Design a protein with these regions (language model features):
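One-carbon transfer enzymes
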Residues: 1-233, 278-280, 287, 306-315
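An anion-binding loop in the catalytic cleft
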Residues: 215-315
Length: 315
């Protein structure tokens, strides 16, 4: 089975690696163009490109694949039996979807039809899901609405973060792909249609603004936000006109009728902050311009008494 693999970030590396190790012919890899990073704006290859080059697989990096006749002609020359997509970063046009014998399949990081969209991993943590997983689906013109071919369920730990779940999902996706491909090739897979409506809201792309903590919300909701947005873009608030990133937090046992955002006190555990229905303890933080550290260490160099309020804007 001749494959073309389309993917970009770290999430898409384990499935590519698994394809190579399982002996599948990966005729080409398609990934996003190199992007400038760091202070020197040095062009950096995508993780998938780096992996492909290690295996001497030809790499293509079109700016856009829609209305790109040159790219389409290249695919026609390759004549893949199947195109495998994992977090590629562009919408796949109809003429590409219909090109391979077995069509295009997508490795999606949720138990479809739940969490269609660009950020299903973080959203599952933010929403407090007890489990999530990976779905391999046949791609159509809709966004994550194609027939489901296989699934794997992943339980979420109580301390699950977006980052920890990301790693689990990537590995599970690789394993599920290798299990599913033979049934696609042999024609024994049983596609399952998705309902038109998803039981969960669309998991839109994560933005930095989503990390702003609103302490008028329940403490449990904020604790999940902190975990879901760790490591990127991180939850944050403002104190004395400076940004304070919050990397870890736990629910306090005490109750509070203070105004949301008020610092109730500090101790070895961290900074106790009043929320809508209780207290959230910030246990690992990072002040603007400083290193990430445990709140106990932070408090040795930053005097914070009970009374001040965290705000949702720079004062």
């Amino acid at each position: 089975m001749k494959t073309v693999y389309m993917g970009t970030p770290d999430f898409a590396v384990p499935p590519l690696k698994a394809l190579v190790e399982a002996g599948y012919e990966v005729a080409a890899v398609v990934t996003q163009p190199d992007k400038p990073k760091g202070r020197g704006k040095t062009l950096m290859a995508t993780p998938v490109k780096e992996e492909a080059l290690m295996h001497e697989i030809p790499v293509y990096q079109p700016q856009k694949i829609r209305n790109n006749q040159e790219f389409l002609d290249t695919l026609k020359e390759i004549q893949p039996d199947i195109i495998i997509v994992a977090a590629f970063g562009q919408i796949i046009p109809k003429e590409v979807l219909e090109l391979p014998k077995y069509g295009c399949i997508n490795i999606h990081a949720s138990l479809l039809p739940k969490y269609r969209g660009a950020a299903p991993i973080q959203q599952a943590v933010i929403d407090g899901e007890k489990e999530s997983g990976v779905t391999i689906m046949q791609m159509g013109e809709g966004l994550d609405t194609g027939d489901m071919l296989s699934k794997i369920v992943i339980p979420l730990d109580k301390e699950e973060t977006g980052g920890s779940l990301f790693g689990k999902m990537a590995q599970a996706g690789a394993e599920l792909l290798i299990k599913t491909l033979p049934s696609i090739e042999q024609g024994t897979v049983t596609p399952e249609k998705q309902p038109q409506e998803s039981p969960t809201p669309y998991a839109a792309m994560i933005t930095k603004q989503m990390g702003l903590m609103d302490f008028s919300k329940p403490a449990a909701e904020l604790e999940r936000l902190v975990r879901g947005l760790n490591p990127w873009p991180s939850a944050y608030t403002f104190v004395n006109g400076k940004t304070l990133k919050v990397w870890k937090s736990v629910l306090g046992q005490e109750t509070s009728d203070a105004e949301p955002g008020t610092v109730m006190g500090t101790d070895a555990q961290g900074i106790h902050v009043a929320c809508k229905d209780g207290v959230l303890i910030l246990t690992e933080v990072q002040l603007e311009g400083k290193k990430r550290m445990e709140a106990e260490v932070f408090l040795r160099g930053y005097h914070m008494e009970a009374g001040p309020r965290f705000t949702d804007h720079k004062e």
